[in-house]
Amino acid sequence: MTENIHKHRILILDFGSQYTQLVARRVRELGVYCELWAWDVTEAQIREFNPSGIILSGGPESTTEENSPRAPEYVFEAGVPVFGVCYGMQTMAMQLGGHVEASNEREFGYAQVEVRTNSALIRGIEDSLTADGKPLLDVWMSHGDKVTAIPSDFVTVASTETCPFAIMANEEKRFYGVQFHPEVTHTRQGMRMLERFVRDICQCEALWTPAKIIDDAVNRIREQVGDDKVILGLSGGVDSSVTAMLLHRAIGKNLTCVFVDNGLLRLNEAEQVMDMFGDHFGLNIVHVPAEERFLTALKGENDPEAKRKIIGRVFVEVFDEEAFRLEDVKWLAQGTIYPDVIESAASATGKAHVIKSHHNVGGLPKEMKMGLVEPLKELFKDEVRKIGLELGLPYDMLYRHPFPGPGLGVRVLGEVKKEYCDLLRRADAIFIEELHKADLYNKVSQAFTVFLPVRSVGVMGDGRKYDWVVSLRAVETIDFMTAHWAHLPYDFLGRVSNRIINEVNGISRVVYDISGKPPATIEWE
């Protein structure tokens, strides 16, 4: 009998904070399963989920407004620990008899809170001490409103000069509220506070580990599909690759992977995918060379969004044709991950944040009577990578920089032509190779090359040439929502430029993109 890794679970109610997914990831890092739901859930839904504890997230609304979101009353009647973060603390305080007021000044950034009373939430946790020996905690604040009176059965655990109730607690009911964000790295002891809540107060065991997740996923796949055949669109990206490895472990040769080579991949990527999954791991793969079909469909198209739609449409057409050629396939597998499915649980009020979906196969074709297998749908990206390592996939593949779903189709500006893709592939390979050689690849978050459809005069030997321009792009970011351009060394950039111009016949000029996000986006299209 496989161990139930969902036995202990935390429910996170989302009030719209940009950090809510980070809260969930932190809980998972502690080895505990959690789910992220919109704030307006019903009592019946909470009862059915049967959480060991509940976390109320932050959010952009003001509890002083009449129609601002509130936690369901049952949250405070369920008999489980509750942890309110920022807005979550404010709505907890207000709903349980305290008072919240709009502050004249928004408090955003680093702060030190002074501990007044001991609490199970911060037992043994401190960053420094005051002159008279009281513990201090370095935290990250981000709030406008503040609690001005706590409920009568709560105590003040910690405060700052401007925030009289930075931490409040009702130890008997195991209700806790903090006016800062323990999930962000700027709150130095935040992870330990979350650990106190999840592991000590909620008494959750660390059952959510890569090895146990794999065992659970394999068993669930076998229960779902039995001896049936399954088809998967394998792109060579992280999600589809880990999905393929899980399915292969679960059902072996009953899995058929379809690899569509659209001509928009990185240098030698098609060969690498076939070698790794076909020859090395022994998966059953159908290789579909479709470069000409994609490039024909893209001919004459300059609009980025139109190019994305064309690439997506042609991929589905090619994949469907291959699927129909296979006999007795009853299941379609997809590399859907947890952020992809959060949107479906978003509140109809629009208060909960919406997560952009990833590029998957695009849904089941109407003619195909197949069931859907999604073994990664409970996992965040970092968890997918960890189980990929456990399954034997190479680190360099799992942790390489993001590559857009449409591939080079959106890194060749304007019309996509084979000539442009071939030049871009070679230039980009040189850039990435040099980043690795200089030990810079893992010091930037994403790096790539863009093909610009403009010609520039160059000099080679005694002659002049009139060839194409490429731009190098490298950024540093934590969440890809904002990004700084990477300050790569001048001698490094010079070396990359010289290699590209000398080794890639057809490129005469290399430029470096120094735009941040915002105002620019990371990708050019």
Swiss-Prot record:
- Sorted alphabetically, which keywords does the UniProt record give? ATP-binding, Glutamine amidotransferase, GMP biosynthesis, Ligase, Nucleotide-binding, Purine biosynthesis
Presence of the UniProt keyword Cytoplasm in the record: no
Q: Which Pfam families match?
A: GATase, GMP_synt_C, NAD_synthase
- Pull one GO CC term from this UniProt entry: cytosol
**What does the organism's lineage look like at the top?**
Bacteria, Pseudomonadati, Pseudomonadota, Gammaproteobacteria, Enterobacterales
Q: What class of enzyme is it?
A: ligase
Q: Which CDD domains match?
A: GATase1_GMP_Synthase, GMP_synthase_C
Q: Which residues form the Glutamine amidotransferase type-1 domain?
A: 9-207
Pathway stated in the Swiss-Prot or TrEMBL entry: Purine metabolism; GMP biosynthesis; GMP from XMP (L-Gln route): step 1/1
Subunit structure, interactors included = Homodimer.
Residue spans crossing the bilayer: none
Extract the InterPro entries matched here: Class_I_gatase-like (IPR029062), GATASE (IPR017926), GMP_synth_C (IPR001674), GMP_synth_GATase (IPR004739), GMP_synthase (IPR022955), GMPS_ATP_PPase_dom (IPR025777), NAD/GMP_synthase (IPR022310), Rossmann-like_a/b/a_fold (IPR014729)
Q: Which residues form the GMPS ATP-PPase domain?
A: 208-400
Task: Sum up the protein's function in the record's words.
Answer: Catalyzes the synthesis of GMP from XMP.
Active site located where?
C86, H181, E183
User: What GO MF annotations does this protein's record show?
Assistant: ATP binding; GMP synthase activity
Residues binding ATP? S235, G236, G237, V238, D239, S240, S241
Keyword ATP-binding set for record? yes
* Native source organism of the sequence: Citrobacter koseri (strain ATCC BAA-895 / CDC 4225-83 / SGSC4696)
Gene3D superfamilies to which the protein is assigned, alphabetical: 3.30.300.10, 3.40.50.880, HUPs (3.40.50.620)
Kindly provide the name given to this protein in its UniProt entry: GMP synthase [glutamine-hydrolyzing]
Q: List the catalytic activities from the record.
A: XMP + L-glutamine + ATP + H2O = GMP + L-glutamate + AMP + diphosphate + 2 H(+)
The EC number of this protein is 6.3.5.2
